């Protein structure tokens, strides 16, 4: 009888854990990678019509654990120092953490330190302590970020054989896993989602494009980049000279990547089935969107186990 009751309790807990979430207040303390993750999240929630959310993003481009903590100390010393914005208003980190009764607060490393956990402390510990002090009701999650494009310049040069996108993925994953275990904080599988989609997608990305002249590019031509989830090459106008510059971003998610990230966060936090989500960004085809949603659903389900 005891065994039966135990099994019933376990089954009930599992069933409750898998119930769709109808409403959530979620704050990210991050950088451009949390901006990528949030880009389409609100629209996905709205278009699916099965949940509501309050989303906050205390983000500064290139912001590490250390910088977030330093910004907080500056705000303590000078209350006028408010480096973040929420609903159009300047905010300190204290302001942000107390602006809503957040259900979830996510934290993450800056990407170029994501595989260097020796640079995270004591700043990550300090931020976690601050969250627990100012938002004790919130559950802390670790945002496991992604590896750069395989053709990112960071992987080339004299040490090119010692580092790669594969190694960045593996090493950052190990570092985030250790942080997750330290704080008993679940890990959001953004890195897994982008990596899995890149490996399994039917259209494989080929970079560099053998037909493109990278040394003598002509505006507005761009290399073929089908299957990319991270931006790659683009043209940018110099505000001073008004000349077009051939530019490379091997770090940030493109529209496909941002849609995949949004779907992953939605499936992970709201436990929603994406089969009947009919919305996607204009530059993502319905067929591709279906594939990306399937990856998001699977990766989110695996991470929630």
Which residues fall in each region the model found?
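Catalytic nucleophile serine of serine hydrolases
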Residues: 32
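Alpha-helical cap/lid subdomain in secreted, periplasmic
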Residues: 91-255, 276
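Sec-dependent N-terminal signal peptides
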Residues: 4-13
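Short hydrophobic segments within beta-strands
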Residues: 27-29, 143
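Long, well-structured alpha-helical subdomains associated
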Residues: 206, 212-216, 222-223, 277-305
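Extended, basic/helix-rich recognition subdomains
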Residues: 238-298
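Conserved SGNH/GDSL esterase-like catalytic core that processes O-acyl groups on lipids
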Residues: 25-26, 35-124, 130, 149
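Boundary at the C-terminal end of the N-terminal hydrophobic targeting segment
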Residues: 15-17, 22-23
